[in-house]
C-alpha cells in the first residue's frame, strides 16, 4: 500500500522500541520535521529519549503529543507475524504499536507535512512532544519535559494526544479528561507465633479483615458531570511464611484509587488513615501519586476536534474520561486544553495488535483539519 501515513507507521513499527528504548523512532520523526522548519530539541532524561519540536512564532501553541515506546510483545510464536515486522492483511496493519500509538504518530507527522506545505505562513506555533517513556514508569518522559518547559516559561495552549481513544468506529469517542491515580502500600503489623497457640500471637490477617471489609465497601464520592465515582481496587495482598503452622507477623496490602475531581488525593489519604486508626491497627503506609485528574471543558480545542471528526466521519464523538491514565495528566499542568483522539483501541497491548489502514489515513486528515481550525 503506497501511502505516506502507512509507510511511516510501518517504519516506526519495525523498530522494537520496548519502553523506554526508542530504537531510533524519534530520529525518523526528526528527519521528517526538520525540512518543514521545525526547531528540534532533544531532551533525554536517564534512559528515556524525549523530543520537543516547534514551528512558528507568535500566537497560540498547538502541540501534538505521543510516545514511541511500546509494551513487550510476549512470545513471538503467538503472533501470526513477528510483532516488529509490520504486515497488512485484509486492510489491517499488524504489529506491536500499530494502534498504541505508532499509527497515531505517523498520522500526526504526515498531517503536519501537509499542513505546512499548504500554509507555510500559518499563525501561532505547531509543536510536537514525543517520549519513549509512557508505557512503563513514565518518570523520565513527558513529566520531565513539561517541568523543563514550565521552568523556562514555555506556553502551551492546546494539546492533542494521539492515544487510541476510539471504541468501535474511528472518532466515536474522544477523551477530554482522565481520572487521577494514587496507590497505597500498607504494612500491618501483628506478632508471629505458632498456630496452635494463637493467644501468644497476633494475626495481622484477622486484625485487618474489618478494615479491608470497610475499605472495599466505602463510597468515596458520587462522581460529577465529568467523572464516574471514584473507585478503589486491592491489587496485591501478601502475608505468611508459606508454612501452615506459623501465624504471620505482617500483612502487606496494596490498593489503588482512580479518583475524580469530586475528591482530592489528600482526602483519600486522610480517610484511609482514619480507617486504619479506627480499627487500632499498627501500620506503616506509603503513597504514590501517579497523576491528578484533569478535565477539558467546552472551548476552542473541543470544538475543533468535534468539528474535524464529524467533517470526515459524520460522527458526533462521545466525550469520556474513562480508562487509565495518560501523559495528558502532565501536559494539563501547563494550563493547556488537552484532548485525546486516536484509532480504535480493541487490540492494544494484545497479541496481533492491529489498526485499520484506512482509519490511519483518515485520522491524519482529521489531525490536519484540527491544525487548520486552531492555528490558521
Curated annotation (Swiss-Prot):
Family: Belongs to the peptidase M20A family. DapE subfamily.
GO aspect biological process, one term: lysine biosynthetic process via diaminopimelate
Function description: Catalyzes the hydrolysis of N-succinyl-L,L-diaminopimelic acid (SDAP), forming succinate and LL-2,6-diaminopimelate (DAP), an intermediate involved in the bacterial biosynthesis of lysine and meso-diaminopimelic acid, an essential component of bacterial cell walls.
Binding site for Zn(2+) 2: 100, 135, 349
Swiss-Prot/TrEMBL keywords: Amino-acid biosynthesis, Cobalt, Diaminopimelate biosynthesis, Hydrolase, Lysine biosynthesis, Metal-binding, Zinc
Lineage top rank: taxon: Bacteria
GO molecular function, one term: acetylornithine deacetylase activity
Translocase among keywords: no
Reaction equation(s) it catalyzes: N-succinyl-(2S,6S)-2,6-diaminopimelate + H2O = (2S,6S)-2,6-diaminopimelate + succinate
Protein species of origin: Proteus mirabilis (strain HI4320)
Active site: 69, 134 (proton acceptor)
InterPro entries, per the entry: ArgE/DapE_CS, Bact_exopeptidase_dim_dom, DapE_proteobac, Peptidase_M20, Peptidase_M20_dimer, Peptidase_M20A
Name the record gives this protein: Succinyl-diaminopimelate desuccinylase
Amino acid at each position: 500500500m503506497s501511502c505516506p501515513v502507512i509507510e511511516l507507521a510501518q517504519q516506526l513499527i519495525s523498530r522494537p522500541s520496548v519502553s523506554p528504548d526508542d530504537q531510533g523512532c524519534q530520529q525518523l520523526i526528526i528527519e521528517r520535521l526538520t525540512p518543514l522548519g521545525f526547531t528540534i530539541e532533544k531532551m533525554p532524561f536517564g534512559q528515556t529519549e524525549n523530543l520537543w519540536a516547534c514551528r512558528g512564532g507568535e500566537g497560540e501553541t498547538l502541540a501534538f503529543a505521543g510516545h514511541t515506546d511500546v509494551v513487550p510483545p510476549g512470545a513471538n510464536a503467538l503472533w501470526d507475524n513477528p510483532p516488529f515486522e509490520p504486515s497488512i492483511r485484509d486492510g489491517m496493519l499488524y504489529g506491536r504499536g500499530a494502534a498504541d500509538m505508532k499509527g497515531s504518530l505517523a498520522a500526526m507527522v504526515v498531517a503536519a507535512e501537509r499542513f505546512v506545505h499548504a500554509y507555510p505562513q500559518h499563525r501561532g506555533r505547531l509543536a510536537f512532544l514525543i517520549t519513549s517513556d509512557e508505557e512503563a514508569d513514565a518518570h523520565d518522559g513527558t513529566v520531565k519535559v513539561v517541568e523543563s518547559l514550565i521552568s523556562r516559561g514555555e506556553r502551551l495552549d492546546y494539546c492533542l494526544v494521539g492515544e487510541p481513544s476510539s471504541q468501535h468506529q474511528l472518532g466515536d469517542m474522544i477523551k477530554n479528561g482522565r481520572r487521577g491515580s494514587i496507590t497505597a502500600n500498607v504494612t500491618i503489623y501483628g506478632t508471629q507465633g505458632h498456630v496452635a497457640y494463637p493467644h501468644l500471637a497476633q494475626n495481622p490477617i484477622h486484625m485487618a479483615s474489618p478494615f479491608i471489609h470497610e475499605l472495599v465497601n466505602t463510597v468515596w464520592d458520587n462522581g460529577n458531570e465529568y467523572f464516574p465515582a471514584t473507585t478503589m481496587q486491592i491489587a496485591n495482598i501478601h502475608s505468611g511464611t508459606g508454612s501452615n503452622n506459623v501465624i504471620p507477623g505482617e500483612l502487606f496490602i496494596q490498593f489503588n484509587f482512580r479518583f475524580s475531581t469530586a475528591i482530592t488525593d489528600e482526602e483519600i489519604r486522610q480517610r484511609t488513615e482514619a480507617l486504619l486508626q479506627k480499627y487500632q491497627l499498627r501500620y506503616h503506609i506509603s503513597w504514590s501519586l501517579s497523576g491528578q485528574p484533569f478535565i477539558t471543558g467546552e472551548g476552542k480545542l473541543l470544538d475543533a476536534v468535534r468539528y474535524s471528526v464529524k467533517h470526515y466521519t459524520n460522527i458526533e464523538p462521545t466525550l469520556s474520561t474513562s480508562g487509565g491514565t495518560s501523559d495528558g495528566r502532565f501536559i494539563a499542568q501547563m494550563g493547556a486544553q488537552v484532548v485525546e483522539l486516536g484509532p480504535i483501541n480493541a487490540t492494544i497491548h494484545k497479541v496481533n495488535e492491529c489498526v485499520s489502514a484506512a482509519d490511519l489515513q483518515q485520522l491524519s486528515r482529521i489531525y490536519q483539519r484540527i491544525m487548520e481550525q486552531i492555528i490558521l
